[in-house]
């Protein structure tokens, strides 16, 4: 997987910008980009967990459509729309960097320089594509066609990855965290893209409710909620275990993370089922 001249130009520009940030430049020079990307993966993961809660709180207002529409009216200002676009950066970075780690861990690909270049190039292409759709604001696609296509791709990728890691000596919890990551690598960027094809798709209660009441879309949403909650919870557990030495504190952390994730799953499943 050689980096093309286009990806090299894109990533050189991105590296040039990042190297102007003193903190980033210092650690990239002294610890390497692999260290920076590792911490970036953890930080973006935490940001996305916070966004998950915000998303659940927002969607809970769908039980009263008028209240939901009133809230969404507050999110129509140019500043909020710009912040929504910025949120795509941690979304796609976490997804694509997760793919890089999987290639490294399980498929033996060791050209990390090329993978890092592709990470930044793909991320840049995604946020630019999203910016185009958000600027146009008039795109549409059949929800059934879109999610059937995306869901099949995600399931096929997840199954192929499961076949790769099934015989490894790790626990089922560890394996499912990786499989859920492959599934979400496809689903979450697609979800983010779909929700910004036009303002009505993500901000008009009638449009959202009509889509979520479709049986197949409801099943897709349920699968996505469970995968996101599990992947997030196991990620928090893994990060905490790296820094918490005490066995008692590890148990306490595990209980707290499990409780928060069960609560998140309950809220998410209730929203999807009741709509």
Summary of predicted features, one role per range:
Residues 1-275:
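Membrane-embedded alpha-helical bundles that constitute the cytochrome b-like, heme-associated redox core
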């Amino acid at each position: 997987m050689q980096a093309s001249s286009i990806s090299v130009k894109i990533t050189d520009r991105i590296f040039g910008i990042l190297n102007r940030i003193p903190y980033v430049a210092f650690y990239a020079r002294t610890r390497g980009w692999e260290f920076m990307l590792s911490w970036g993966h953890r930080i973006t993961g935490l940001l996305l967990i916070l966004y998950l809660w915000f998303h659940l709180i927002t969607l809970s207002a769908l039980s009263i459509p008028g209240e939901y529409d009133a809230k969404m009216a507050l999110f129509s200002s140019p500043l909020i729309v710009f912040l929504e676009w910025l949120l795509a950066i941690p979304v796609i970075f976490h997804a694509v960097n997760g793919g890089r780690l999987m290639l490294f861990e399980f498929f033996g690909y060791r050209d990390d320089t090329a993978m890092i270049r592709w990470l930044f190039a793909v991320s840049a292409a995604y946020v630019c594509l999203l910016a185009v759709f958000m600027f146009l604001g008039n795109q549409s696609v059949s929800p059934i066609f879109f999610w059937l296509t995306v869901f099949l791709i995600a399931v096929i990728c997840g199954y192929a990855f499961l076949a790769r890691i099934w015989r490894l000596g790790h626990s089922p919890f560890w394996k499912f965290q990786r499989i859920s990551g492959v599934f979400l690598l496809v689903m979450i960027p697609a979800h983010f893209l779909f929700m910004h094809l036009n303002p009505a798709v993500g901000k008009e209660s009638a449009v959202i409710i009509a889509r979520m009441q479709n049986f197949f879309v409801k099943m897709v949403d349920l699968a996505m909620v469970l995968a996101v909650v599990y992947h997030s919870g196991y990620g928090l557990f893994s990060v905490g275990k790296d820094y918490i030495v005490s066995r008692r504190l590890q148990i306490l952390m595990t209980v707290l993370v499990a409780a928060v994730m069960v609560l998140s799953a309950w809220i998410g499943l209730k929203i999807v089922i009741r709509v």
